[in-house]
A protein has these predicted regions:
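Beta->alpha loop/short-helix hinge microenvironment recognizer with preference
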Residues: 1-386
Length: 386
């Protein structure tokens, strides 16, 4: 892999060449990849869907002018696969339209919980179980710390979004959580705001997440519900597994919280940035010469700048497949006040309390929930579906 730093994210393809897309890469190399690597039915379907998305092979529909001017426009059908970078804008717009009606008029924190890379070999063989375990450990840890901690002592509401990739498409499992800066009192009679831009102590949260995750991992091991194969086949030995667990308990797990957003409008925009993102968007692809894929990645050493990453096409496809979600897996989940069982009760009570009280409310809910999804799609993405 070669990495070249550049000063900005504006890295167009060479003059005269079309912008590369994931579909172009898969059309050129997916068959060769499948000949040399085991590919399941779900991965094969992803290859087919993305390669044929918005092409004549999926069919077309004809749009005509309703007042008889004779104008016609042919549009190719989309594949609607959740892993297709072309098919996320509409899903995102619809989701944001629905969520905008449930946001509370308060500030929000962004909390990120990351799993140690030492777990990657085990996660790759047990994706669904361990992704679920991460959601459980993070949500319970945050909820218990918020409700029991003396400086808050309230139930917050939060949305958690699973991402599995780094900027270079490596396997990097982490949760993004958008959390209300405060919560409903345990008695349900008042809103308790977070004090001094401080939600909960992140070190304590990291320890709680670590403990809950490793306790759950131990239970899965004892129940024989973990798969061990290939170069981790030896991990099924209780002595070896215990050694791994002990090592993980001694490690500092990465959890951080960013300063709060200024209100629902900002968190609405932020959620749109993270929710329906796939591992690689077409906008990040810079060049494809038939053999090498070049894409841009953030340069953490120089904030605001980007670097070029060059990968052989087959390695690029391998990394892309690392981030295929289990079939039917729910990667966006809601907890606390945002949980479905609380939406009609505790969430509405919190909304009434916030709208009745002064300065803790930064802004009223936006008017975005009153526009159509077509208007919202245009606002968020610049795509006009009409």
């Amino acid at each position: 892999m070669q990495i070249q730093k550049v000063a900005s994210d504006q890295m167009p393809p060479p003059s005269g060449e079309p912008s590369p897309e994931l579909a172009h890469i898969l059309r050129a190399h997916a068959d060769a990849y499948m000949q040399n690597h085991p590919v399941g039915s779900q991965q094969g379907k992803i290859f087919r869907d993305i390669r044929h998305c918005r092409t004549p092979s999926l069919g077309v529909h004809l749009e005509t002018c309703g007042i008889g001017c004779g104008y016609e426009r042919v549009s190719f059908h989309s594949c609607r696969n959740r892993h297709c970078p072309k098919c996320q804008s509409l899903q995102k717009a619809r989701w944001l339209l629905e969520r905008s009606q449930k946001l509370l008029p308060t500030t929000y924190f962004h909390v990120v919980v990351t799993l140690p890379h030492e777990l990657n070999p085990l996660i790759l063989r047990n994706r669904e179980r361990l992704y679920n375990l991460l959601f459980e450990a993070a949500s319970k840890g945050l909820s218990e710390l918020a409700t029991g901690w003396k400086r808050l002592g309230a139930q917050p509401g939060f949305t958690a979004i699973l991402h599995t990739w780094s900027q270079e498409l490596r396997f990097h499992v982490h949760l993004h959580m958008v959390v209300t800066a405060g919560g409903l009192s345990l008695e349900g009679d008042r809103w308790i705001p977070a004090k001094n831009d401080f939600l909960v102590p992140v070190r304590a949260l990291a320890k709680m997440v670590r403990g809950k995750f490793l306790d759950g991992l131990q239970w899965l091991f004892e129940q024989g519900q973990l798969t061990f194969s290939g170069n981790i086949a030896g991990w099924r030995n209780p002595v070896v597994f215990k050694r791994l667990a002990r090592k993980l308990r001694r490690m500092k797990w990465v959890v951080y919280a960013e300063p709060p957003f200024s209100g629902p409008r900002h968190v609405f925009s932020y959620l749109g940035h993270y929710t329906h993102r796939v591992a690689i968007s077409n906008q990040r692809l810079v060049a494809f010469d038939g053999q090498t894929v070049t894409f841009r990645a953030r340069n953490n050493e120089q904030p605001g700048s980007y670097r070029r990453v060059d990968l052989p096409a087959l390695e690029f496809i391998r990394r892309f497949l690392l981030h295929v979600l289990p079939k039917g897996f729910i990667r966006i989940r809601h907890f606390g006040l945002m949980a479905s069982r609380n939406v009609q009760t505790k969430l509405e009570q919190a909304r009434r309390l916030l709208q009745a009280s002064p300065p803790t409310t930064q802004t009223r809910p936006t008017k975005d929930h009153r526009i159509t999804w077509q208007q919202l799609l245009l606002k968020l993405t610049g795509i006009d579906p009409t």
